């Protein structure tokens, strides 16, 4: 079978054809060695296990134990999710005499690999039944003939049961016939034996020939060694055998002694003397024959070394009582050793084998050395496989090459001779010098540590050997099968296949072998002549004319440019390290000279347009290919995957919006309208209805005093605002309650009086910022009682016109609670009176200082050094104090009015937005506060701003966009969906939409300070008629407002309101509601009823699929080309990413107490990053019980989702296994870090580098469950919890785990010092050749922490940052300070935050 370590592959179309043929009927797949039969077996097995019942078994049969062992490893690597068992004679199967033992060993086993004899015996004894098997795979199927166990399996147990429940048959072979005399009857016999039909990929023969490189066949003639040359040692050995005295043989002596003792051994004695066979004599004969053959093949000096080695090793084993000689009697060992002592040049006193002499090597061996040296020197990438007939010759040639001066430093030699013969027989002295089998030889050869393997025929059939550029047959192949199999090992381009041929030999010339092979293949594949003819026809001139024009643009598709267009389309579908996105073409010769073609596009393309056929027939493949490409590309255009310019579909920006030239990639400053000023509208209403006023009662609650009331009159009704909290100082808070009163109609006199009262109240505090005697206020204020009635004390006659001394008021016995603000003579500071007292005939005032602050909306930080003077009572002499005329409580109200009116102003903006732009969303007035929060940037309010809602809205928009695009574009590949979604949620697109809708007018971007506050006058507001001056704002901030409003609408009414908001603010896209999209996606999903083998997977996931193909699609990598495939998982991963993000973000936003947006971003990044998801994928397992075939004790096998990934890339499997090793190395540390550490263990995850497809699997499974459950988020949450993600999130939230990334934390610790990650050298570590990235953190130019290393740059920088953080935090002066007063926050998708993917 083909080696599985070749370059990454996409199952070639001829391989896919063979799998499909096998799904339909029993076949014998005949393809050249190296053409990928292993991949066919793997995909056919996977397909069978997906559709058969869970109690069925796939049984793979191979002719040798070595081949079984190799394929066992291949199956385990490619199908790790299924129980796999290897059975061989090593397992002492002859002791398994009870059905219970077999039942135990096969418990939860889905794939068995064994030799044919193992299955035959199991069937013969009834331990295994044919009805229990679902698929029988016969590797090297040409063995199924005569009395071979493969044939007996079929003749004794399969054919008699035809008509009952039987397994499918798949035969694999490169040579269906083992002999040179091939007839049609021979082929038919093999087909009859296997109840199958010989199939070869006739449809794709041209492709097959492209991938299978036939080597250049050459011969090396060598002279046969003279027969009369003899060495003294060999002559003595042959003489010892010829003149062997049977009377002295220990076995004969024992028989004669038994006869003397009365035992009836006459028959045995007669047999010995007639046949002359005893064990000692047979050993001499075997040694002499092997030595004589070796002298002919390798030469006298090599033969002498071999004999000395065998005899010396035998002597050593006798003296050490080696276990290999346990079956020998002591007399036999001594007797044979004494005979061998008589050989010349043998010194049995030394146990060291004398060195070999190179003086008398055979001409054949010398030619081999000369040829190998020449080839190795010519080709720096020399790799060679030398087939040698006998095992002992392998050892001898290896020794020659190891010591020969021309080869010892040039060739790196390994040996491979497979398993020894029956290990239960007595040791053979002639085989003592055989090389022991070295399994590491193959691994070292693949790794390049060896460049030449000396092997016996065991490497002919199926053993996984990397492709060689040179294959040498030291002896001519014994049969056609050997010739074909060995030739298949030379699979590199420009490779050579060399056969040594004796000049006087009788064996066939290699050219005749090739001729016979072609004749044999013609019996079942009569296409070689057609291929040759097709090659000639390809060189002929053929033209075609067909056009397709897009009327709107004039873009023209022709037969000549279609292939180029199609290749470009496929190239941008999304590249990957394991994926070949090129279109594949198949050609079919309908009749001689008439060809048609079919093209197959990558798996990411929708099935409806994935294939296309040529419209016409052609004489050449070139034109058929162009025709198929033309039809394919036209179909892509019709499906909307190609635009009117005949380019891959791209969403053009709206012309009107694109004129704004706002880039999509990063924040930039763009001109926007200033924030809506609500008061001019009030002035116009006042002008139109001067006597109508709407009343709002304001109530001030303080800690010590009783509530104070003020009525606010406005020409338009004010929106209702909730209780307003004002900050008097760092410890004292004031509350303002507002309530609506019925509107009133005032006469001119009442209005005039109210304006005067308003003027007096405001003037008491803001006299420096008011125009003298100007009273055209747009709103009015006046004292009122609890019911809202105007206080009688408002009449001007009751209020003094001027200030007066405090002593005068005391003398008048005036109530101090009605006094105005107090100040000392010559001091502008104002105080509120608290009480009066007499001390030593001196009146004293207890006063509390009035704050100079004008902003009471924001808390006063302790660090601001605001003392407690605003609540502490000071004492002053009354004679030094001046009292203002307006009662102090109303002056305090006036001091608070700017803050109150600012809050009302923001509420008016939000209410205006609610009733205008957001009118279609139908929000209630009660939601104005939420809208206000959604409109405020962090610069406007550092505590209560849009950022939490933006965090939620960003996620909601991406979710809505994802499900909408999936439903609206069912044929779009993931790359198109990702590009379109990226444009919809990009800063540029959202900023353009914000400006186009006029939403920028509602953004509140400036923080209230009150420092320059002054009352607004109606005359000024009405006079403002010029165009508003544009302001520059960040496009990110503008875009965030849409997301925050979406978040607010979702908070109010879930996805229904959120989608209405999206439809309103982003009207260019024809949005589909979430429920409608869910229905569309569910209905579009394929539903097949014959997938019965997914029980383990569904148990792992914790969900039973109604449409099971969705589950297979979620686990199908784009490199897969097997059966039962709808699409690869990219679209589901695209959806699952949004679903997972939504589940996490929703829980974070709903958490109580509320989390800051920085914490939410950090936690979400931690719980959805690729390393964490891959970790959870590895950790999510179930136990499956199996029985250890050696100890017969139960064992628990871990089954995991990742084991069921359907891919077609060996390199993907290698990277998966590497990620699993990394996981196992750090698993315990990560678990402790996740469960016990106060900080998320970013630095431990940085020690792993899982490939993206692992985290993709998590998201694709979630996406599949979402579609299958019709968008049931609770079901999806259950899956996310099953994967351990939500449990980790709960732990983080419950224990306050800090998830800030070390690189971000280091930036905070560094404050204003620059942070650099300086790369240190470029070292290649010896461990698997991984290139490790090393870096050193520098803070302010100083090295901090140790040098850190990682598999990639980001990994190394993360570990380095973690180390540096530890150093800085250990210093006394370090303190982390997270800056939160920035105007906007960047998340990872928008270019900010921490991205965990190495760029």
Swiss-Prot record:
It holds the Pfam family DSRM_2. Residues 897-1054, 1094-1270 form the RNase III domain. Coiled coil: none annotated. InterPro entries: DEAD/DEAH_box_helicase_dom (IPR011545), Dicer_dimer_sf (IPR038248), Dicer_dimerisation_dom (IPR005034), DSRM_2 (IPR056755), Helicase_ATP-bd (IPR014001), Helicase_C-like (IPR001650), P-loop_NTPase (IPR027417), RNase_III_dom (IPR000999). The keyword Glycoprotein does not apply. Its EC number is 3.1.26.-, 3.6.4.-. Residues 18-194 form the Helicase ATP-binding domain. Its cofactor is Mg(2+); Mn(2+). ATP binds at residues 31-38. Mg(2+) binds at residues 1133, 1256, 1259. GO terms for molecular function: ATP binding; helicase activity; metal ion binding; ribonuclease III activity; RNA binding. Residues 364-549 form the Helicase C-terminal domain. Residues 1301-1370 form the DRBM domain. A motif (DEAH box) lies at residues 139-142. SMART domains: DEXDc, HELICc, RIBOc. The record marks 1252 as: Important for activity. The keyword RNA-binding applies. Residues 562-656 form the Dicer dsRNA-binding fold domain. Keywords: Antiviral defense, Antiviral protein, ATP-binding, Helicase, Hydrolase, Magnesium, Manganese, Metal-binding, Nucleotide-binding, Repeat, RNA-binding. GO terms for biological process: defense response to virus; regulation of defense response to virus; siRNA processing. GO terms for cellular component: cytoplasm; nucleus. Dicer-like endonuclease involved in cleaving double-stranded RNA in the RNA interference (RNAi) pathway. Produces 21 to 25 bp dsRNAs (siRNAs) which target the selective destruction of homologous RNAs leading to sequence-specific suppression of gene expression, called post-transcriptional gene silencing (PTGS). Part of a broad host defense response against viral infection and transposons. Belongs to the helicase family. Dicer subfamily. This is Dicer-like protein 2. It comes from Phaeosphaeria nodorum (strain SN15 / ATCC MYA-4574 / FGSC 10173) (Glume blotch fungus). The lineage of its organism: Eukaryota, Fungi, Dikarya, Ascomycota, Pezizomycotina. The gene is DCL2.
């Amino acid at each position: 079978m083909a080696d599985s370590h070749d370059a990454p592959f996409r199952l070639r179309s001829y391989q896919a054809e063979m799998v499909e043929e096998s799904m339909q009927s029993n076949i014998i797949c005949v393809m050249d060695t190296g053409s990928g039969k292993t991949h066919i077996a793997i995909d056919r097995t996977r397909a069978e296990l997906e559709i058969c019942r869970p109690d069925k078994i796939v049984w793979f049969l191979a002719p040798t134990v070595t081949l079984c062992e190799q394929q066992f490893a291949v199956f385990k690597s490619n199908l790790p999710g299924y129980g796999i068992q290897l059975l061989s004679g090593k397992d002492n199967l002859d002791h398994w005499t009870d059905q219970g033992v077999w039942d135990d060993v096969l418990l939860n086993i889905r794939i068995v690999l064994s030799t044919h004899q193992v299955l035959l015996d199991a069937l013969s004894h009834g331990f295994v039944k044919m009805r229990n098997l679902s698929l029988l795979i016969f590797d090297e199927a040409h063995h199924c003939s005569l009395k071979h166990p493969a044939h007996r399996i079929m003749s004794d147990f399969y054919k008699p049961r035809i008509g009952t429940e039987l397994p499918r048959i798949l035969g694999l072979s490169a040579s269906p016939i083992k002999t040179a005399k091939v007839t049609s009857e021979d082929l038919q016999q093999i087909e009859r034996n296997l109840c199958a039909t010989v199939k070869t990929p006739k449809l794709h023969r041209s492709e097959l020939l492209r991938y299978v490189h036939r080597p250049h066949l050459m011969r090396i003639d060598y002279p046969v060694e003279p027969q009369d040359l003899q060495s003294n040692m060999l002559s003595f050995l042959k003489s010892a055998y010829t003149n062997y005295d049977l009377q002295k043989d220990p076995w004969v002596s024992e028989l004669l002694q038994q006869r003397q003792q009365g035992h009836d051994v006459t028959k045995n004695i007669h047999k010995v003397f007639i046949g002359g066979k005893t064990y000692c004599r047979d050993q001499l004969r075997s040694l002499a024959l092997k030595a004589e053959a070796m002298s002919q093949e390798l030469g006298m000096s090599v033969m002498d070394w071999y004999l000395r080695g065998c005899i010396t090793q035998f002597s050593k084993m006798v003296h050490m009582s080696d276990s290999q000689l346990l079956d020998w009697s002591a007399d036999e060992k001594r007797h044979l050793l004494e005979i061998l002592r008589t050989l010349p040049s043998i010194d049995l006193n030394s146990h060291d084998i004398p060195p070999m002499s190179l003086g008398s090597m055979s001409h054949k061996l010398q030619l081999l050395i000369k040829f190998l040296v020449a080839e190795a020197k010519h080709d720096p990438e020399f790799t060679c496989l030398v087939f040698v007939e006998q095992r002992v010759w392998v050892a001898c040639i290896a020794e020659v090459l190891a010591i020969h001066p021309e080869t010892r430093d040039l060739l790196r030699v390994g040996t491979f001779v497979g398993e020894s013969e029956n290990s239960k027989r007595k040791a053979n002295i002639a085989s003592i010098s055989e090389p022991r089998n070295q399994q590491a030889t193959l691994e070292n050869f693949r790794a390049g540590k060896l460049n030449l393997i000396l092997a016996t025929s065991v490497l002919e059939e199926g053993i996984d050997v990397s492709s060689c550029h040179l294959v040498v047959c030291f002896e001519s192949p014994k049969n056609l099968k050997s010739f074909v199999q060995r030739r298949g090992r030379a699979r590199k381009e420009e490779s050579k296949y060399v056969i040594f041929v004796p000049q006087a030999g009788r064996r066939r010339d290699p050219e005749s072998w090739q001729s016979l092979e072609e004749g044999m293949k013609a019996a079942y594949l009569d296409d070689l002549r057609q291929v040759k003819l097709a090659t000639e026809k390809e060189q002929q001139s053929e033209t075609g004319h067909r056009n397709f024009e897009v009327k709107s643009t004039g873009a023209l598709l022709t037969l000549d440019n279609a292939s180029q267009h199609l290749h470009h389309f496929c190239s941008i579908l999304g590249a990957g390290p394991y994926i070949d996105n090129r279109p594949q073409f198949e050609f079919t010769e309908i009749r001689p000279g008439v060809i048609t073609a079919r093209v197959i596009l990558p798996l990411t393309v929708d099935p409806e347009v994935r294939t296309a056929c040529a419209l016409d027939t052609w004489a050449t493949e070139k034109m058929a290919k162009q025709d198929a490409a033309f039809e394919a590309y036209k179909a892509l255009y019709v499906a909307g995957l190609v635009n009117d310019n005949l380019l891959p579909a791209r969403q053009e920006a709206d012309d009107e919006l694109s004129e704004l030239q706002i880039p999509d990639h990063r924040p930039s400053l763009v001109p926007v309208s200033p924030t809506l000023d609500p008061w001019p509208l009030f002035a116009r209403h006042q002008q139109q209805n001067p006597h109508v006023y709407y009343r709002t009662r304001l109530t001030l609650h303080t800690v010590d005093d009783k509530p104070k009331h003020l009525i606010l009159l406005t020409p338009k009704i004010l929106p209702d605002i909730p209780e307003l909290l004002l900050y008097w100082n760092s410890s004292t808070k004031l509350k303002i309650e507002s309530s609506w009163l019925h509107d009133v109609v005032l006469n001119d006199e009442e209005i005039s009086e109210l304006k005067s009262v308003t003027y007096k109240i405001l003037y008491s505090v803001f006299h420096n910022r008011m125009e003298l005697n100007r009273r055209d206020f747009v709103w009015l204020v006046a004292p009122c009682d609890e019911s809202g009635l105007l206080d009688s004390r408002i009449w001007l006659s009751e209020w003094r016109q001027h200030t007066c001394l405090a002593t005068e008021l005391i003398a008048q016995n005036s109530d101090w609670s009605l006094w105005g603000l107090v100040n000392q003579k010559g001091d502008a500071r104002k105080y509120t009176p608290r009480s009066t007292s007499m001390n030593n005939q001196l009146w004293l005032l207890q006063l509390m200082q009035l704050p100079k602050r004008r902003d009471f909306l924001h808390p006063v930080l302790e660090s601001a050094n605001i003392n407690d003077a605003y609540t502490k009572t000071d004492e002053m002499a009354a004679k030094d104090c001046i009292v203002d005329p307006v009662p102090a409580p109303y002056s305090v109200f006036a001091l608070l009015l700017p803050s109150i009116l600012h809050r009302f102003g923001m509420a008016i903006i939000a209410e205006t937005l609610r009733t205008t732009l957001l009118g279609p969303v139908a929000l209630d007035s009660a939601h104005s506060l939420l809208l206000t929060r959604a409109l405020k940037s962090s610069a406007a309010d550092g505590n209560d701003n849009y950022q939490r809602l933006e965090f939620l809205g960003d996620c909601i928009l991406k979710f809505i966009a994802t499900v909408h695009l999936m439903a609206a574009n069912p044929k779009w590949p993931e790359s198109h969906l990702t590009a379109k979604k990226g444009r919809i949620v990009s800063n540029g697109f959202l900023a353009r939409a914000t400006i186009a809708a006029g939403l920028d007018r509602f953004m509140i971007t400036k923080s209230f300070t009150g420092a320059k506050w002054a009352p607004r006058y109606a005359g000024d507001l009405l006079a403002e008629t010029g165009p508003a001056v544009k302001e520059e704002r960040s496009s990110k901030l503008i875009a965030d407002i849409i997301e925050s409003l979406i978040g607010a609408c979702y908070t109010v009414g879930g996805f229904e309101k959120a989608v209405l908001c999206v439809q309103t603010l982003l009207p260019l896209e024809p949005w589909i509601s979430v429920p409608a999209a869910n229905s569309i996606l569910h209905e579009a999903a394929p539903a097949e009823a014959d997938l019965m083998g997914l029980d383990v997977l569904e148990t792992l996931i914790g969900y039973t699929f109604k449409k099971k193909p969705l589950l297979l699609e979620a686990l199908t990598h784009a490199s897969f080309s097997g059966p039962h495939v709808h699409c690869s998982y990219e679209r589901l991963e695209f959806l699952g990413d949004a679903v997972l993000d939504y589940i996490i973000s929703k829980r974070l936003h709903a958490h109580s107490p509320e989390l800051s947006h920085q914490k939410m971003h950090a936690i979400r990044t931690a719980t959805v990053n690729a390393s964490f998801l891959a970790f959870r994928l590895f950790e999510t397992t179930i136990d499956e019980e199996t029985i250890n075939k050696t100890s017969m004790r139960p064992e628990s096998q871990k089954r995991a989702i990742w084991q069921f990934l359907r891919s077609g890339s060996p390199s993907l499997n290698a990277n998966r296994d590497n990620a699993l090793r990394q996981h196992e190395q750090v698993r315990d540390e990560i678990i402790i870090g996740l469960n016990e550490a106060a900080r998320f263990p970013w630095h431990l995850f940085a020690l792993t580098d899982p490939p993206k497809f692992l985290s993709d699997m998590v998201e694709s499974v979630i996406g599949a469950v979402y579609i299958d459950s019709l968008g049931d988020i609770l079901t999806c949450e259950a899956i996310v919890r099953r994967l351990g993600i939500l449990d980790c999130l709960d732990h983080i939230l419950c224990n306050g785990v800090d998830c800030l990334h070390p690189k971000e934390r280091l930036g905070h610790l560094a404050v204003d010092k620059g942070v650099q990650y300086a790369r240190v050298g470029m070292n290649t570590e010896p461990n698997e050749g991984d290139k490790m990235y090393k870096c050193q953190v520098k803070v302010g130019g100083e090295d901090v922490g140790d040098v850190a290393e990682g598999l990639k740059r980001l990994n190394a920088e993360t570990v380095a940052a973690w180390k540096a953080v530890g150093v800085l935090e250990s210093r006394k002066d370090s303190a982390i300070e997270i800056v939160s007063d920035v105007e906007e926050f960047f998340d990872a998708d928008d270019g900010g935050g921490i991205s965990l993917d190495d760029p």
